[in-house]
Amino acid sequence: MQNRIMYKQYLQAGIFKVMQIDATRVAGPQEIVLEYLLANKFGVRVCPPHAGGVGLCEAVRHFAMFDYLAVSGQWDDRVIEYVDNQHEYFVHPTEIVNGRYKAPTAPGSGVDMKLEAAERYLYKG
């Protein structure tokens, strides 16, 4: 779904048992946070946003932390995707410890690319 209005309507209709946000379709971090809060209000658990693409694991790990620390306080029934490739292009790549994403230690979104990786794939047309 593309926005909080659609999520709210589906939540009001009782359609979801579990909600998984697509971080690439919604309007940024604020929208994702709002969708977590809406789901919590309606008693629907959220699995963190899809992480199946270049840089998406780095981008969505923060939302899993936000859910645990500020919304649900739950780890037990939360599942997050992990794609084990192309992390070498990022300054702060995602790390997995004991089957869980390791909390980021640097500020920011976590999707800062290494300069050499950006230059390698830069369109030179």
Residue ranges of model-derived segments:
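Shared catalytic-loop signature of beta/alpha-barrel
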Residues: 1-100
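C-terminal extensions of enzymes
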Residues: 87-125
